């Protein structure tokens, strides 16, 4: 998937070597990928069927920002928990899975095929590809899609969404949540206000002060959002 941005979506370049792209707890070696990736239009047909079990392969906070209508939330905090969640389904069921860009689903797809599941479908290119190719009128998507860069969330046509990120807990924030009395820019939000220590709040407040000072002197601060 390719998408354009008017600003630098990442603060800096990082290259890491990891054993797994998305840790799931099982090895994939010399395996032929199942040919069951559906394009957005094919996907719409499959998920509208009553016997299709639609599963969101992402984390709960991503699900809360937006998801497909009638999709199931596995309520996982990391991808290693996903196999255990999948084991509850019957091998004869029609399983349709999706994630942000398709990577997580590729691994889950292989996992289910190895377990003997016959009817498994994944969204080719993930949610990003879907939002880029399906207009809102024909869409089965509800809400926005969380992305792991400075855009925070995107809408149909890959337009930037309305969410921002809390500097205290790094969780996405809606416009409504930012109106809460527990929200303080750069420090905390309703999701972390009651969980942060006084020391953490003090450190975050100092960081926010530095960002404001940098802005006044027209200097770029590494933590300053550019959207």
Please describe what each predicted stretch is:
Residues 1-36, 52, 59-95, 103-227:
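Rhodanese-like catalytic fold shared by cysteine-dependent sulfurtransferases
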Residues 35-39, 47:
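A conserved helix-loop-strand patch within extracytoplasmic ligand-binding domains
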